[in-house]
Amino acid sequence: MPSVHPVVRDDAVIWAALTYEGAARHAIAAYKDGGRTDAAAALAGPLRAAIVAALAAVPGGRQGRGAGRCDAGPGIQLVTIPSSRRAWRVRGYHPVDALLHRAGLHPFPALAQRTEALDQVGLGRAARAANKSNSLVARRSLDGVLVILVDDIVTTGATLLEARRAVAAAGGTVVGLATLAETRRLLSP
């Protein structure tokens, strides 16, 4: 069972199931970049657990019925961060969407890439924030829609914070953030 824990990045509390190190790091890297789609079987459960924790933290107790249930209830949508065009071409699938489907959940396709941001690997905290600034846009109006943002790995939080901005700009409200894993690298400016 994963050790779901809160991660704070700027003013955001993000629920993460794993720490991106050791076996978790190898499994996630193999799944995302090594073509090991079979690793989804091991990774879907931890991501689901992070989403359950995010739902449990929503004011009004929208966590669902019973321990471990992931019943978002009416109006709460699971919104993933869209893959870059390059990543889609290389992989042929969107890793987080595939994990949600494997966990019996359904992503709500609310966001699109406005600009093709650089790969975040190797960028520091400030460079990541600048790289992601205004890179996402909502595909439609999100007026009145409650959202839990879901991503694979949180480092500095730049991607999730940009997604939160894009959802708010379209009229939606982010009520939670969940990730498969968090890494503690690159937390200094």
Which residues make up each language-model segment?
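Glycine-rich phosphate/pyrophosphate-handling loop used in enzymes and phosphotransfer proteins
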Residues: 1-189
